[in-house]
UniProtKB/Swiss-Prot annotation:
Transmembrane segments: none annotated. This is Ribonuclease HII. It catalyses: Endonucleolytic cleavage to 5'-phosphomonoester. PANTHER family: RIBONUCLEASE H2 SUBUNIT A (PTHR10954), RIBONUCLEASE HII (PTHR10954:SF18). It comes from Sulfurihydrogenibium sp. (strain YO3AOP1). The lineage of its organism: Bacteria, Pseudomonadati, Aquificota, Aquificia, Aquificales. The keyword Cytoplasm applies. It is an enzyme of class 3 (hydrolase). Keywords: Cytoplasm, Endonuclease, Hydrolase, Manganese, Metal-binding, Nuclease. Pfam families: RNase_HII. Its main location: cytoplasm. Residues 14-197 form the RNase H type-2 domain.
Amino acid sequence: MDNVEKELFSQGYEKIVGIDEAGRGPLAGPLVIASVIFPKHQKPFIHTDSKGLSEKEREYLFEKIHDYAEEINITIVENTEIDKFGISNAAKIYMENNLKSLKSKWDIALVDFVKLDESINHLPLIKGDEISHTIAAASIIAKVVRDRIMIEYKEKYPNFSFDKHKGYATKQHYQEIKKFGITPIHRRSFNLGVNDD
Protein backbone atom coordinates (compact mmCIF):
# COMPACT_ATOMS: atom_id res chain seq x y z
CA MET A 1 0.00 0.00 0.00
CA ASP A 2 3.01 2.33 -0.19
CA ASN A 3 3.72 2.24 -3.95
CA VAL A 4 2.35 5.78 -4.41
CA GLU A 5 4.57 7.16 -1.66
CA LYS A 6 7.62 5.20 -2.91
CA GLU A 7 7.16 6.59 -6.42
CA LEU A 8 6.86 10.16 -5.13
CA PHE A 9 9.92 9.81 -2.89
CA SER A 10 11.87 8.49 -5.91
CA GLN A 11 10.83 11.65 -7.79
CA GLY A 12 12.45 13.78 -5.08
CA TYR A 13 9.52 14.62 -2.81
CA GLU A 14 10.60 14.70 0.84
CA LYS A 15 7.42 15.25 2.85
CA ILE A 16 4.08 13.77 1.83
CA VAL A 17 0.77 14.51 3.53
CA GLY A 18 -2.30 12.30 3.19
CA ILE A 19 -5.74 13.82 3.73
CA ASP A 20 -9.21 12.28 3.91
CA GLU A 21 -12.62 12.85 5.46
CA ALA A 22 -15.33 10.92 7.28
CA GLY A 23 -19.02 11.73 7.38
CA ARG A 24 -19.87 12.89 3.87
CA GLY A 25 -23.14 10.96 3.69
CA PRO A 26 -24.80 11.13 7.14
CA LEU A 27 -27.97 13.08 7.87
CA ALA A 28 -26.57 14.42 11.14
CA GLY A 29 -23.30 15.42 12.74
CA PRO A 30 -20.09 16.90 11.39
CA LEU A 31 -17.77 16.14 8.53
CA VAL A 32 -14.35 15.34 9.99
CA ILE A 33 -11.21 15.97 7.94
CA ALA A 34 -7.82 14.59 8.97
CA SER A 35 -4.37 14.96 7.47
CA VAL A 36 -1.34 12.87 8.41
CA ILE A 37 2.38 13.21 7.73
CA PHE A 38 4.68 10.25 8.42
CA PRO A 39 8.49 10.37 8.53
CA LYS A 40 9.94 9.68 5.08
CA HIS A 41 11.19 6.17 5.85
CA GLN A 42 8.21 5.04 7.90
CA LYS A 43 7.37 1.43 7.05
CA PRO A 44 3.64 1.10 6.29
CA PHE A 45 1.61 -0.68 8.97
CA ILE A 46 -1.86 -0.09 7.51
CA HIS A 47 -2.93 -2.59 4.89
CA THR A 48 -6.56 -1.66 4.27
CA ASP A 49 -8.74 1.45 4.36
CA SER A 50 -10.89 2.31 7.39
CA LYS A 51 -14.03 0.76 5.87
CA GLY A 52 -12.39 -2.68 5.88
CA LEU A 53 -11.52 -2.52 9.59
CA SER A 54 -13.51 -3.34 12.69
CA GLU A 55 -14.05 -0.63 15.31
CA LYS A 56 -11.47 -2.31 17.56
CA GLU A 57 -8.89 -2.43 14.74
CA ARG A 58 -9.49 1.24 13.92
CA GLU A 59 -9.03 2.24 17.57
CA TYR A 60 -5.75 0.28 17.73
CA LEU A 61 -4.43 1.87 14.53
CA PHE A 62 -5.63 5.31 15.69
CA GLU A 63 -3.21 5.06 18.63
CA LYS A 64 -0.42 3.60 16.48
CA ILE A 65 -0.75 6.39 13.90
CA HIS A 66 -0.43 8.94 16.71
CA ASP A 67 2.73 7.15 17.90
CA TYR A 68 4.43 7.24 14.48
CA ALA A 69 3.12 10.34 12.70
CA GLU A 70 5.16 13.52 12.49
CA GLU A 71 1.99 15.58 12.41
CA ILE A 72 -1.78 15.04 12.51
CA ASN A 73 -4.24 17.84 11.79
CA ILE A 74 -7.98 17.50 12.42
CA THR A 75 -10.74 19.80 11.18
CA ILE A 76 -14.36 19.52 12.35
CA VAL A 77 -16.90 20.88 9.85
CA GLU A 78 -20.20 21.44 11.65
CA ASN A 79 -23.56 20.63 10.05
CA THR A 80 -24.36 24.35 9.76
CA GLU A 81 -21.30 24.83 7.53
CA ILE A 82 -22.33 21.81 5.44
CA ASP A 83 -25.79 23.37 5.00
CA LYS A 84 -24.22 26.73 4.11
CA PHE A 85 -21.75 25.51 1.45
CA GLY A 86 -23.11 22.10 0.42
CA ILE A 87 -21.25 18.91 1.31
CA SER A 88 -18.87 18.85 -1.69
CA ASN A 89 -17.87 22.51 -1.40
CA ALA A 90 -17.55 22.24 2.39
CA ALA A 91 -15.24 19.23 2.01
CA LYS A 92 -13.08 21.07 -0.54
CA ILE A 93 -12.91 24.37 1.41
CA TYR A 94 -12.05 22.76 4.73
CA MET A 95 -9.58 20.28 3.22
CA GLU A 96 -7.71 23.24 1.74
CA ASN A 97 -7.84 25.06 5.10
CA ASN A 98 -6.60 21.94 6.89
CA LEU A 99 -3.58 21.61 4.59
CA LYS A 100 -2.76 25.33 4.86
CA SER A 101 -2.82 25.15 8.67
CA LEU A 102 -0.30 22.29 8.96
CA LYS A 103 2.79 23.32 10.92
CA SER A 104 5.11 21.16 8.79
CA LYS A 105 6.29 22.34 5.40
CA TRP A 106 5.12 19.58 3.07
CA ASP A 107 5.78 18.96 -0.63
CA ILE A 108 2.66 17.21 -1.95
CA ALA A 109 -0.75 16.19 -0.63
CA LEU A 110 -2.36 12.86 -1.50
CA VAL A 111 -6.14 13.21 -1.60
CA ASP A 112 -8.84 10.56 -1.92
CA PHE A 113 -10.22 11.87 -5.23
CA VAL A 114 -11.13 15.42 -4.28
CA LYS A 115 -9.82 18.07 -6.68
CA LEU A 116 -8.49 20.99 -4.66
CA ASP A 117 -7.44 24.48 -5.75
CA GLU A 118 -4.62 24.38 -8.30
CA SER A 119 -2.47 26.53 -5.99
CA ILE A 120 -2.21 23.48 -3.69
CA ASN A 121 0.24 20.83 -4.89
CA HIS A 122 -1.86 17.70 -4.63
CA LEU A 123 -2.53 14.38 -6.30
CA PRO A 124 -6.17 13.20 -6.35
CA LEU A 125 -6.25 9.39 -6.31
CA ILE A 126 -9.20 7.15 -7.16
CA LYS A 127 -9.78 4.91 -4.11
CA GLY A 128 -6.82 6.66 -2.54
CA ASP A 129 -7.48 5.16 0.89
CA GLU A 130 -6.94 1.71 -0.66
CA ILE A 131 -3.64 2.46 -2.41
CA SER A 132 -1.91 5.02 -0.17
CA HIS A 133 -1.04 4.22 3.45
CA THR A 134 -0.87 7.97 4.22
CA ILE A 135 -4.44 8.54 3.01
CA ALA A 136 -5.52 5.33 4.79
CA ALA A 137 -4.07 6.71 8.04
CA ALA A 138 -5.95 10.00 7.56
CA SER A 139 -9.12 8.02 6.84
CA ILE A 140 -8.77 6.08 10.11
CA ILE A 141 -8.12 9.23 12.16
CA ALA A 142 -11.14 11.00 10.65
CA LYS A 143 -13.43 8.00 11.13
CA VAL A 144 -12.46 7.39 14.78
CA VAL A 145 -12.74 11.08 15.70
CA ARG A 146 -16.16 11.33 14.05
CA ASP A 147 -17.45 8.12 15.66
CA ARG A 148 -16.39 9.42 19.08
CA ILE A 149 -18.23 12.70 18.48
CA MET A 150 -21.40 10.85 17.49
CA ILE A 151 -21.20 8.61 20.58
CA GLU A 152 -21.04 11.77 22.70
CA TYR A 153 -24.11 13.12 20.88
CA LYS A 154 -26.02 10.04 22.03
CA GLU A 155 -25.73 11.46 25.58
CA LYS A 156 -27.03 14.85 24.47
CA TYR A 157 -29.84 13.46 22.30
CA PRO A 158 -30.86 10.18 24.01
CA ASN A 159 -33.84 9.65 21.67
CA PHE A 160 -31.40 9.09 18.80
CA SER A 161 -29.13 6.06 18.44
CA PHE A 162 -26.16 8.14 17.30
CA ASP A 163 -23.83 5.66 19.01
CA LYS A 164 -25.06 2.98 16.59
CA HIS A 165 -25.96 4.54 13.24
CA LYS A 166 -23.55 7.50 13.66
CA GLY A 167 -26.05 9.79 11.93
CA TYR A 168 -26.20 7.78 8.69
CA ALA A 169 -29.43 7.32 6.72
CA THR A 170 -30.56 4.04 8.28
CA LYS A 171 -34.15 2.90 8.65
CA GLN A 172 -33.80 3.32 12.42
CA HIS A 173 -32.55 6.88 12.05
CA TYR A 174 -35.44 7.87 9.75
CA GLN A 175 -37.88 6.37 12.26
CA GLU A 176 -36.28 8.42 15.07
CA ILE A 177 -36.55 11.62 13.01
CA LYS A 178 -40.20 10.88 12.25
CA LYS A 179 -40.97 10.24 15.93
CA PHE A 180 -38.86 12.91 17.65
CA GLY A 181 -38.21 15.54 14.97
CA ILE A 182 -34.85 16.92 13.94
CA THR A 183 -32.09 18.03 16.32
CA PRO A 184 -29.72 21.01 16.03
CA ILE A 185 -27.06 18.66 14.60
CA HIS A 186 -29.16 17.45 11.65
CA ARG A 187 -28.18 18.64 8.17
CA ARG A 188 -31.22 20.56 6.97
CA SER A 189 -29.94 20.60 3.38
CA PHE A 190 -30.14 16.80 3.31
CA ASN A 191 -33.31 14.76 2.73
CA LEU A 192 -34.37 14.04 6.31
CA GLY A 193 -37.69 12.51 5.35
CA VAL A 194 -39.67 15.32 6.97
CA ASN A 195 -40.96 18.71 5.85
CA ASP A 196 -39.14 21.39 7.86
CA ASP A 197 -40.84 24.70 7.09
